[in-house]
Amino acid sequence: MSYIKMKDNCRNFSLSKWQDTRKPWLILIIVTIGLTCIAHFLFQEYLFMKPCEQCVYIRFDMLVMAIGGMIALINPANNIIKIFSYSLAFYGIWLGLEHCLTLNHIHEVVHSENPFAGVDGCREIPIYPFNLPLYKWAPSWFLPTGECGMDTPVVPENAYNHLNAFQKFFIGTPPDFENGLYSNGWYLIPSLKFMNMAICCLIAFLCCFVVLFAMFIAYVLDKNKPNAKIFALVIVALVLVLKFIGESKNPNQNIASLNQVVLRYS
């Protein structure tokens, strides 16, 4: 009976109908906010891994996607709601892919034998889209305090005597902190230095893109939604507008050269 019921459910499943429900958008919110909270509370606050410029940008990208999901929860079947929810979700993914690739490039350069090749710089004061001063509104979340490409734990001396066994397992024991799982930085498999944080975040953004794009195509091709193609064009246009109008360039911002950062570790 359970097999027959499962077979009927598969037959009745429609991606177009599913994207009209709150479930996929709720999953998107849980994933993006969950990853952001893990980065902040676990890695930054608990394991003393300070976020760099690209790291806080990735948090912003996740937040943009989550806001898109929250808007969709109002009425996911409404076309006007879809315009804002899909646009923000795709916009956040676009930014996220760019920032992950940049972070991975910086990580590879900093850990290579020639750390001065191909790196422009790392800002101490971040520049967010539309010049949003997020680093002022929520500095603990959106102000970079770490070095570009260096995600090793930086434990303050006043915390040496207060580390528990769980923390020591990941960051090591004082004063050298060389025997922890993440003493050489965060990797999915630390012993092999396999898949750094940038690559894992990149995969997360790609997975979100694949699911959302499949939902978007199902919405466009739904024969019961004759105006879907028009709304889809509006969504694409809005994503482009957000991307290119949101780009902010302020030459007066304080910029710290990444070459100076690398000199500290050379």
Curated annotation (Swiss-Prot):
Lineage top rank: taxon: Bacteria
Keywords: Cell inner membrane, Cell membrane, Disulfide bond, Electron transport, Membrane, Oxidoreductase, Redox-active center, Transmembrane, Transmembrane helix, Transport
GO cellular component, one term: plasma membrane
Cysteines paired by S-S bonds: 52-55, 122-148
Protein's membrane topology: Multi-pass membrane protein
GO biological process: protein folding
GO molecular function, one term: protein-disulfide reductase activity
Reported function: Required for disulfide bond formation in some proteins. Part of a redox system composed of DsbI and DsbL that mediates formation of an essential disulfide bond in AssT.
Protein's name according to its UniProt entry: Putative protein-disulfide oxidoreductase DsbI
Gene: dsbI
